[in-house]
Amino acid sequence: MDKFLIDVTVEIPKSSKIKYEYDRKTSQIRVDRILFGSESYPQNYGFIANTLDWDGDELDCFIFADQAFLPGVVVPTRIVGALEMVDDGELDTKLLGVIDCDPRYKEINSVNDLPKHRVDEIIGFLKTYKLLQKKEVIIKGVQSLEWAKKEYQVCVDLMKQYGKLPKDEFIAKMQKLHPEHYQK
């Protein structure tokens, strides 16, 4: 099986309660908020440059690793699957990957190779981390590596075609052109 390697820029270290977010306009990682509840990120979390997901931000990725990485660090990541998710009415895919330069993860090549409990931790986190904000997150399913590759390519194409639009304009345009990706 061919490896699907991508550089992922870390926004949020594993175990953090701080929600950092990349700002494409300024090319900086900013503090977005402190999580409202007692949750913390179960794995490192970041974005993939030159991609645009349906929520108007770069495509997101959880990186399974034993270490917590600093915001802004680029981690070579082997993508193994994805979570298909709807966040506050917008499709917001989360790719799932493992650090590629750690031999402890060399045997993990698909989402089925990950410990189920670790995937369930991420699902549980995503279902609950916005409850106190009164926002709904729906996990539609755990998806395969092939599905993740296709979603990645869609997000690369969206960035090429619409990446210069402000986020609000992009979402408004996509809601008209592709209402199937929005539940508002």
Swiss-Prot record:
One of its GO terms (biological process) is phosphate-containing compound metabolic process. One of its GO terms (molecular function) is magnesium ion binding. CDD domains: pyrophosphatase. Substrate binds at K19, R33, Y45, Y129. Mg(2+) 2 binds at D60. It is found in: Cytoplasm. It is an enzyme of class 3 (hydrolase). Mg(2+) 1 binds at D55, D60, D92. It catalyses: diphosphate + H2O = 2 phosphate + H(+). Keywords: Cytoplasm, Hydrolase, Magnesium, Metal-binding. Gene3D superfamilies: Inorganic pyrophosphatase. Its cofactor is Mg(2+). Its EC number is 3.6.1.1. GO terms for cellular component: cytoplasm. Its main location: cytoplasm. It comes from the Bacteria. Catalyzes the hydrolysis of inorganic pyrophosphate (PPi) forming two phosphate ions. Homohexamer. Belongs to the PPase family. This is Inorganic pyrophosphatase.
